[in-house]
C-alpha cells in the first residue's frame, strides 16, 4: 500500500517513527524558511512540516508547486509537538506527486465557498471531499450495517427479490417500463408481493435491502425516482401492533448505533442526535384528522394526509408529546393497497400504519390479508385484474399464515435523522425527475 497509516491512526506511540501518509492537498503555506502541507484523507488531516534545514532541497522546492487537490504520498518522521495545529506533524523524507489536479476546481471541497446543490451533484466526486458531506455517507454506511445487525439478531433471513417484473406491485401507472427481450416488463417499485410469498415457504421472518424504482413526476425535497428500501415481513403475527413494535425496535437500534459509532461524524456535522423517546406514540388516522382540524387544516375522511398536514402534525407531536417519531394507524381501506387486511367488524378501516419522523412519512406497513378468497375480492375492489397476480395468489392457496411487514425508506430515514433539508444530499448519485447523469 502507498500509505501505512490514515490520519487518525497516528498516535503518540508513533512519535519518532517513520510513516507513509497519502491523500489530497488541502492547503500549502510558504513561510520562507519553513513550508507546510495539510493533507486530507477520509479520516481527517495530516500536517506536513518542512523546515529548510531538515528536509532535502528537492522536497523544499517541490512544495510551493503543489496545487489544491493534488494527490500526494509523504514518507517521514512523526513529531508530536504542541506547536502543530493538530498536536503532531510529519517531517518529510520523501514526497511523491501521484496525480495533479486541474485548476480551477469545479467547487471548493472545503465548503468555505458555497456551491449550489446542482453544481455539487454534477461534481459529486469532489463534493464528497468535503468532510461534512463525507460524514453523511459514513453515517449512511452505519445505518445499513445497523439494519442488518438488528434483523440478524431478531432471527430474520435476508432475501433478494427480482427487480425486473411483469406486473405492478400495487397497480397504478407509476412504473418504469422496459423491453425484456420480446416482452414488456417494468422496474420493481417494491418487493411487496415477493416478500409476502416468502411467508408461505416457512422462512417466517425475512428482510431485504434493495433499490426501488418509482416513475412519479414529483420534484420535491423528499422524493427520488430511485431509492433504497428496507423491507421486512414476518409470519404468525396476531395483529399489526406487533409489526409496529418491530419497526420501533429497528429505528431505535439504528439511531443508537449511529450515536455510538459515529460520534466523530456527528461532531463534524455539528449535529446532536438524540436518543428516540419510546414508546413511539400511536394515534389513529381519525385522531390525526381531529388534531389537524383543531389546527385549522381540514382533510376529508378517506384521503391521505398531505405534506402540509404532515408538517403540522409533526410540529404538534413535537410540542405536545415531545416525540419526533410517531405512528398513524387504522387507515381508511380505500387509502391503502389491496393486500392490507381490513377489520372484519369495520371493513372501511384497515390494519395499516405509517411511521412519521418529524412530519415526514418514512415507513408504511401493516397486517396483510392472508385469506385467499378475501384477498381475491380486494384485488377486484381496487379495479385490478386478478390474472395479473396469479403467481402471487397461488402462494395463498396452499397454506398462508397471518403475516405483516413494512417498507422503510432509507434515504428518508437518514434525511430526517440528520435533519437534512433535501433528500438528494443523502444518496450518492440521485435519480429524480431531471437528473440521470452522473
UniProtKB/Swiss-Prot annotation:
Details of cofactor binding: Binds 3 Mg(2+) cations per subunit. The strongest magnesium site (Mg1) is bound to the beta- and gamma-phosphates of ATP and four water molecules complete its coordination sphere.
GO CC terms: aminoacyl-tRNA synthetase multienzyme complex; cytosol
Residues that bind L-aspartate: 170, 214, 364, 368
Molecular function GO labels: aspartate-tRNA ligase activity; ATP binding; magnesium ion binding; RNA binding
Name under which the protein is recorded: Aspartate--tRNA(Asp) ligase
Reaction catalyzed: tRNA(Asp) + L-aspartate + ATP = L-aspartyl-tRNA(Asp) + AMP + diphosphate
Origin organism lineage: Archaea, Methanobacteriati, Methanobacteriota, Thermococci, Thermococcales
Protein species of origin: Pyrococcus horikoshii (strain ATCC 700860 / DSM 12428 / JCM 9974 / NBRC 100139 / OT-3)
InterPro entries: Aa-tRNA-synt_II, aa-tRNA-synth_II, aa-tRNA-synth_II/BPL/LPL, Asp-tRNA_synthase_2, Asp/Asn-tRNA-synth_IIb, NA-bd_OB-fold, NA-bd_OB_tRNA
Coiled-coil region: none
Amino acid at each position: 500500500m502507498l500509505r501505512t497509516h490514515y490520519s487518525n491512526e497516528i498516535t503518540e506511540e508513533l512519535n519518532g517513527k517513520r510513516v507513509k501518509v497519502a491523500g489530497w492537498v488541502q492547503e500549502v503555506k510558504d513561510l520562507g524558511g519553513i513550508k507546510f502541507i495539510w493533507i486530507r484523507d477520509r479520516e481527517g488531516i495530516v500536517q506536513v512540516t518542512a523546515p529548510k534545514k531538515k528536509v532535502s532541497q528537492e522536497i523544499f522546492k517541490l512544495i510551493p508547486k503543489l496545487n489544491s487537490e493534488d494527490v500526494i504520498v509523504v514518507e517521514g518522521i512523526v513529531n508530536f509537538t504542541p506547536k502543530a495545529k493538530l498536536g503532531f506533524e510529519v517531517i518529510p523524507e520523501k514526497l511523491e506527486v501521484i496525480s495533479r489536479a486541474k485548476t480551477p476546481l469545479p467547487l471548493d471541497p472545503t465548503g468555505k465557498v458555497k456551491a449550489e446543490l446542482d453544481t455539487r451533484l454534477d461534481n459529486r466526486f469532489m463534493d464528497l471531499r468535503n468532510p461534512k458531506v463525507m460524514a453523511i455517507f459514513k453515517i449512511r454506511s452505519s445505518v445499513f450495517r445497523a439494519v442488518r445487525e438488528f434483523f440478524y439478531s431478531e432471527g430474520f433471513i435476508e432475501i433478494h427479490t427480482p427487480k425486473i417484473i411483469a406486473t405492478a406491485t400495487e397497480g397504478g401507472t407509476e412504473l418504469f417500463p422496459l423491453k425484456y427481450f420480446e416482452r414488456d416488463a417494468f422496474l420493481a417499485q417494491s418487493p411487496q408481493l415477493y416478500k409476502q410469498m416468502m411467508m408461505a415457504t416457512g422462512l417466517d421472518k425475512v428482510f431485504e435491502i434493495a433499490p426501488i424504482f418509482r416513475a412519479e413526476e414529483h420534484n420535491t425535497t423528499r422524493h427520488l425516482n430511485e431509492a433504497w428500501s428496507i423491507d421486512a415481513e414476518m409470519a404468525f403475527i396476531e395483529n399489526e401492533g406487533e409489526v409496529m413494535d418491530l419497526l420501533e425496535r429497528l429505528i431505535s437500534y439504528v439511531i443508537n448505533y449511529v450515536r455510538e459509532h459515529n460520534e466523530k461524524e456527528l461532531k463534524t456535522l455539528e449535529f446532536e442526535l438524540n436518543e428516540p423517546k419510546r414508546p413511539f406514540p400511536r394515534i389513529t388516522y381519525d385522531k390525526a384528522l381531529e388534531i389537524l382540524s383543531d389546527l385549522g387544516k381540514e382533510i376529508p375522511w378517506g384521503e391521505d394526509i398531505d405534506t402540509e398536514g404532515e408538517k403540522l402534525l409533526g410540529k404538534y407531536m413535537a410540542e405536545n408529546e415531545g416525540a419526533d417519531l410517531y405512528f398513524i394507524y387504522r387507515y381508511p381501506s380505500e387509502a391503502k393497497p389491496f393486500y392490507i387486511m381490513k377489520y372484519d367488524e369495520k371493513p372501511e378501516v384497515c390494519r395499516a400504519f405509517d411511521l412519521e419522523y418529524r412530519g415526514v412519512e418514512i415507513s408504511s406497513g401493516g397486517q396483510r390479508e392472508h385469506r385467499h378468497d378475501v384477498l381475491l375480492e380486494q384485488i377486484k375492489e381496487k379495479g385490478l385484474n386478478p390474472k395479473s397476480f396469479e403467481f402471487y395468489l397461488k402462494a395463498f392457496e396452499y397454506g398462508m399464515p397471518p403475516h405483516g411487514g413494512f417498507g422503510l425508506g432509507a434515504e428518508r430515514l437518514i434525511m430526517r435523522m440528520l435533519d437534512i433539508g433535501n433528500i438528494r444530499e443523502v444518496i450518492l448519485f440521485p435519480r429524480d425527475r431531471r437528473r440521470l447523469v452522473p
